[in-house]
Structure formats: structure tokens, C-alpha cells
């Protein structure tokens, strides 16, 4: 093996792309800040039992585990920042009984990539709201997610909506056990209505519930899906409430293209209600995902309503606006000491000043000039 090789699905970020990422990160955090979201920076590594909440079984497959040489205990390298933020809200910020608005932007590490085209070291950015159960909180986060996509230069974005509460309500009413519910959830993802129908028939479910489960994979499309669902799904209060929430989101974004899929249920995840995602042209999967995950903080001692979204900023590199490097001022190496005061003054003003040792450099070809002493004063002389 060559010493310069990196593991599969791991890559360096070179200067041009690094400038793009850092510029976008700064703009995103500024956007979050003016909406009231405070930055938190959880550690890259924690005790494994804190990272693996046992709510999301899929997370354990993504998490890289190591042994702590200090304590002998098992540590995990984070694969998702959301459980860490839930811990912070539940424990470190527990003095606030009201709403906590929190945001983050940092690397995570996956034991396996999410797909053949995905990296194992995403730069996960996101925003989360704790302590507010009303649909208005979800609408606020969706609005922030869509604004984030504008910063990432995603162009026209399609907003996809779902609601796991509908499936849960039907499962409870049909008295499905945990194993049956998990099986049906997995089948729903493939939209194989034939297999779903065969499965509910094998379980000998009551006809009303069997029909409802078979119908869910067919309930997808535009805003009209909601009225269709109201007329065809069983009249359960939880189902009606979920449809009301979806309608409220649709009404809040009248100019946004919306796709509704009532069988988009995200297997092996911690979401409990409304689900939302953003899709953009030329991306094979959602560019951002979010939803409600009430009670996640209960694992850390304080169950609270919660909603939020996140995305991998590194996956946007090909679409991020170009961040040009500032033209540099050169100063000859033999003049550097004598010009030190002038050099530092320029740098304090934000000007890039590079010492020219005469053997080439990696600064922009478009130079701002060269620092020369003219009439006893150090000045930038244009080329």
C-alpha cells in the first residue's frame, strides 16, 4: 500500500473546496444565529452508551467503537450529532424549561457509507428546536432548511413530506406487535403493494386495517394526496391530526413545490411524527432531512418535544458558490524584516501578505501588488 493512500470513501479537501466549505459554513451559522439558534460543539468522541441511544438501531452499525486507554471503557466516534444535542438539552441546558434553539456544524464519521456515492466523513450541519410541540415549530425549521439550501446554491428545491404518526396510529389500532410493525415498515419503503397485501393477509388482520396498510404505499403525489387520504383512511383522531399537520405545512409554503408520501417512514430511525426532506436537481438522494423526534432526550433523563434537520455540507461541494482567494501582496524576503510593521498593519486590515522567497508560491496569480519602499514609505506597488 502506498503511504499516501486513504481509506475507501475518505478524502482530503483541498484549498479551493475548503474555502467554499468554510464560506458556506460561516454563512449557515450566521443564518442560524439571526433566527435565534445558538451554536453548540459536542465532542467528536463519547462513551458508546451515550452515543448509542438504542432508539435508532441503524446508528450502531454506523458508529466506530474504540477502547479508551485511560478508563478501559468503550468509546464511540460520533456518527450523528443529533443524539449529542439531545443530551445537551436534557442535561447541560436543563435549567431552561422553555424552548432551546441549537445548531451545529461539524464532522461525523461512519463505519460504512450511506451509499456508493457517499463519503464516510460527512460535515454535518443542522438546527434543532427543543421544548415546543406545536406544528409551528416544524414550520420554522422547514423554513430554515429551505433558506439553508439557498445558501448552498441548490436552485429549485422540492419539499418532501411524510408523517410516521399515521403508520403508528394504524399499527396501534390494528394491535400489531413490535416485530410486525418493524416488518411492515421495511416493506413500505419498497412500495411493493403486493408484498404488503400478502403480509397483512398472512397475519389475518381485520379487513379495514389490511386495506389501510395496503393503501399507504399508494398515497403519494402532490398536495391533493391529503384530501384523498382523508376520504380513504380509517377515521382515527391520530390520523386526522397528522393530516392536519401536513396541511398546515402545505399552507405555510404556498409557492414551494411539495411532494407528499405517506409511506415515507424512515426505517430504523428515531423520528416520531412529521418527516420532511429537501430534494434538488442532480442529487440522487435528499440534500437535507428532518423531522420530529419527541422524547429522544428521555434517554438522557429529560424527554422533550423536538424537531430539527441536518445535511452533509461536504456533499454540496460541486454546487457551492466559488469562494475566490483574496489577491495577495508580495514582499521580498530581503525586505521582510525591515517592512515588518507595514506588513502587520496590512494583515490587521485583512489583507493577505506573503513573503516571496523567490522559488514560487501557491498564492493567487492575480496579485494585489508588491510591497516596496518608496520615498521612505512602504507602499503597495501595483504590477
Curated annotation (Swiss-Prot):
Pathway: Amino-acid biosynthesis; L-histidine biosynthesis; L-histidine from 5-phospho-alpha-D-ribose 1-diphosphate: step 1/9
MF GO annotations: histidine-tRNA ligase activity
Keyword set includes Cell cycle: no
UniProt superkingdom: Bacteria
Keywords, ordered alphabetically: Amino-acid biosynthesis, Cytoplasm, Histidine biosynthesis
Location in the cell: Cytoplasm
Biological process, per Gene Ontology: histidyl-tRNA aminoacylation; L-histidine biosynthetic process
A Gene Ontology term for the protein's cellular component: cytoplasm
Role this protein plays: Required for the first step of histidine biosynthesis. May allow the feedback regulation of ATP phosphoribosyltransferase activity by histidine.
Extra remark: This function is generally fulfilled by the C-terminal part of HisG, which is missing in some bacteria such as this one.
Sequence similarity: Belongs to the class-II aminoacyl-tRNA synthetase family. HisZ subfamily.
Assembly behavior: Heteromultimer composed of HisG and HisZ subunits.
Identification of the protein by name: ATP phosphoribosyltransferase regulatory subunit
Organism of derivation: Neisseria meningitidis serogroup C / serotype 2a (strain ATCC 700532 / DSM 15464 / FAM18)
Amino acid at each position: 500500500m502506498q503511504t499516501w493512500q486513504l481509506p475507501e470513501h475518505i478524502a482530503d479537501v483541498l484549498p479551493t473546496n475548503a474555502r467554499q466549505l468554510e464560506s458556506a459554513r460561516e454563512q449557515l451559522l450566521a443564518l442560524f444565529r439571526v433566527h435565534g439558534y445558538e451554536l453548540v460543539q459536542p465532542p467528536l468522541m463519547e462513551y458508546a452508551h451515550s452515543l448509542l441511544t438504542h432508539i435508532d438501531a441503524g446508528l450502531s452499525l454506523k458508529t466506530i467503537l474504540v477502547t479508551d486507554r485511560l478508563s478501559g471503557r468503550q468509546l464511540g466516534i460520533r456518527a450523528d450529532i443529533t443524539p449529542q444535542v439531545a443530551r445537551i438539552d436534557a442535561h447541560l441546558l436543563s435549567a431552561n424549561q422553555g424552548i432551546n434553539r441549537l445548531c451545529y456544524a461539524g464532522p461525523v464519521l461512519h463505519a460504512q457509507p450511506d451509499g456508493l456515492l457517499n463519503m464516510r466523513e460527512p460535515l454535518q450541519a443542522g438546527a434543532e428546536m427543543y421544548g415546543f410541540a406545536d406544528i409551528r415549530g416544524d414550520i420554522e425549521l422547514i423554513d430554515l432548511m429551505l433558506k439553508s439550501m439557498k445558501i448552498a446554491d441548490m436552485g429549485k428545491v422540492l419539499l418532501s413530506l411524510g408523517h410516521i404518526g399515521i403508520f403508528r396510529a394504524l399499527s396501534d389500532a390494528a394491535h400489531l406487535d413490535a416485530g410486525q410493525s418493524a416488518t411492515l415498515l421495511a416493506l413500505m419503503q419498497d412500495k411493493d403493494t403486493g408484498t404488503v397485501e400478502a403480509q397483512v393477509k398472512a397475519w389475518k388482520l381485520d379487513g379495514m386495517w389490511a386495506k389501510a396498510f395496503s393503501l399507504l404505499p399508494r398515497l403519494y403525489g402532490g398536495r391533493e394526496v391529503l384530501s384523498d387520504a382523508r376520504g380513504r383512511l380509517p377515521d382515527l383522531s391520530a390520523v386526522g391530526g397528522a393530516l392536519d399537520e401536513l396541511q398546515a405545512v402545505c399552507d405555510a409554503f404556498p409557492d414551494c413545490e411539495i411532494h407528499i408520501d405517506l409511506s415515507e417512514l424512515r426505517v430504523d430511525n428515531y423520528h416520531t411524527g412529521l418527516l420532511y426532506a429537501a430534494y434538488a436537481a442532480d442529487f440522487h438522494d435528499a440534500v437535507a432531512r428532518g423531522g420530529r423526534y419527541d422524547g429522544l432526550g428521555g434517554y438522557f433523563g429529560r424527554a422533550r418535544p423536538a424537531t430539527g434537520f441536518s445535511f452533509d455540507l461536504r456533499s454540496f461541494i460541486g454546487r457551492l458558490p466559488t469562494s475566490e482567494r483574496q489577491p495577495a501582496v508580495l514582499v521580498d524576503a530581503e525586505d521582510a524584516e525591515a517592512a515588518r510593521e507595514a506588513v502587520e498593519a496590512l494583515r490587521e486590515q485583512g489583507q493577505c501578505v506573503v513573503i516571496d522567497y523567490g522559488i514560487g508560491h501557491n498564492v493567487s496569480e492575480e496579485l494585489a501588488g508588491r510591497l516596496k519602499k518608496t520615498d521612505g514609505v512602504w507602499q503597495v506597488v501595483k504590477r
